[in-house]
């Protein structure tokens, strides 16, 4: 590992963090990248200092609250100062059954090309390391226009506001409100696809388990670079400067609190906490992942659980890419589009459209599992 970057991990302001030689792989050199994905490869961590501060375990909760509130207000102001091709309506909706007294803000994005009623729905969960939520960073309006669907965007609580399960409760509240108000929103509750990138993908997959527990049955889930586990189990870690193994560790520690890396919490916290049995009856999934994402091996493990549970699952891994480089410029606005990123964007769009067009759910798997259980153990 390059000396300067290795020392950066062990510097004084990262107290109690030790990165031992041979345990971290330095991937900051663009040579690691696919030739069409080397732009936006290494970002000086100093440019990301506000984000890192919000999940730095050495920073007080009071400091995080002050910085996070200021930063979030700027993001929302940025949204409203942007030119829009869709209308955006904001609602405050009741809390979910597990936290009924806590309202959640929900945005409803409506393009001009939707039908008067019974529209498809893109339930889009914005990413941002669970410490920031910037709808401008993702092409939500573009996706709604291209797929002729209504966008539902939960403005969930961030980890410096409330720890797990607050964000999942908010996503649950938004989904329940959407289904309960389907006619008013001119949507079809049986044609809802969840999606999100990074922590948005993590929350989309985790929300899938919450919805399954409550009897909801979304059409599918399409994610990009989702985090699936907070337990570091396999091999050395990667260092890229922004949302690498160090950043992900601190970000998930901030979100999970005392439940961090604990087997006492299930897949509604982190999807790969699921057992194979938990995955039976899970919605169809399309996962897009970078080869050098910090928890790529955990994500592959989660994918194999879906296969063992006979859920519809498709997994795309892109070589020469890490969490935030230009490979995903079309999907989540990182860098400038190139041939490789346009191909990724096309596959992503195809997966969304497949969820809308085809019913890929497998209800018979649940029935066969129940029958087999009954045959083996009786009533």
Residue ranges and their predicted role:
Residues 2-28, 51, 89-379:
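Alpha/beta-hydrolase superfamily serine-hydrolase fold, recognizing
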Residues 33-94:
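An N-terminal hydrophobic leader/cap segment in hydrolases
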């Amino acid at each position: 590992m390059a000396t300067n970057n290795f020392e950066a991990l062990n510097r004084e302001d990262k107290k109690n963090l030790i990165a031992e030689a041979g345990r971290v792989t330095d991937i900051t050199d663009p040579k690691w990248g696919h030739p069409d994905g080397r732009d936006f490869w290494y970002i000086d961590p100093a440019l990301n200092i506000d984000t890192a501060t919000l999940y730095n375990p050495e920073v007080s909760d009071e400091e995080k609250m002050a910085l996070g509130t200021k930063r979030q207000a700027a993001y929302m102001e940025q949204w409203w100062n942007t030119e829009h091709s869709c209308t955006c309506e904001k609602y405050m909706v009741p809390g979910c059954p597990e936290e009924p007294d806590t309202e959640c803000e929900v945005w409803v994005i409506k393009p001009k090309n939707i039908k008067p009623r019974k529209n498809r729905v893109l339930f889009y969960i914005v990413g941002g390391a669970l410490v920031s939520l910037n709808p401008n960073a993702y092409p939500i309006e573009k996706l709604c226009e291209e797929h002729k669907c209504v966008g539902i965007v939960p403005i969930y609580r961030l980890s410096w506001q409330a720890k797990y399960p607050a964000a999942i409760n908010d996503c649950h509240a938004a989904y329940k409100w959407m289904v309960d108000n389907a006619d008013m929103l001119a949507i079809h509750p049986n044609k809802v696809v969840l999606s999100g990138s990074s922590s948005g993908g993590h929350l989309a997959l985790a929300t899938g388990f919450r919805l399954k527990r409550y009897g909801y049955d979304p059409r599918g889930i399409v994610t990009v670079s989702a985090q699936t586990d907070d337990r570091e189990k396999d091999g050395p870690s990667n260092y890229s400067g922004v949302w690498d193994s160090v950043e992900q560790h601190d970000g998930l520690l901030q979100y999970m609190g005392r439940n961090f890396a604990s087997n006492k919490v299930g897949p509604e916290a982190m999807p790969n906490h699921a057992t194979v049995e938990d995955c039976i009856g899970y919605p169809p999934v399309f996962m897009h992942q970078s080869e050098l994402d910090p928890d790529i091996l955990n994500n592959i493990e989660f994918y194999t659980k879906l296969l063992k549970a006979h859920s519809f699952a498709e997994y795309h891994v892109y070589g020469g890419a890490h969490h935030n480089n230009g490979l995903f410029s079309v999907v989540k606005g990182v860098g400038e589009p190139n041939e490789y990123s346009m191909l990724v964007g096309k596959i992503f769009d195809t997966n969304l459209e497949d969820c809308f067009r085809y019913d890929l759910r497998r209800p018979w798997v649940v029935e066969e599992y129940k029958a087999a259980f009954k045959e083996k153990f009786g009533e």
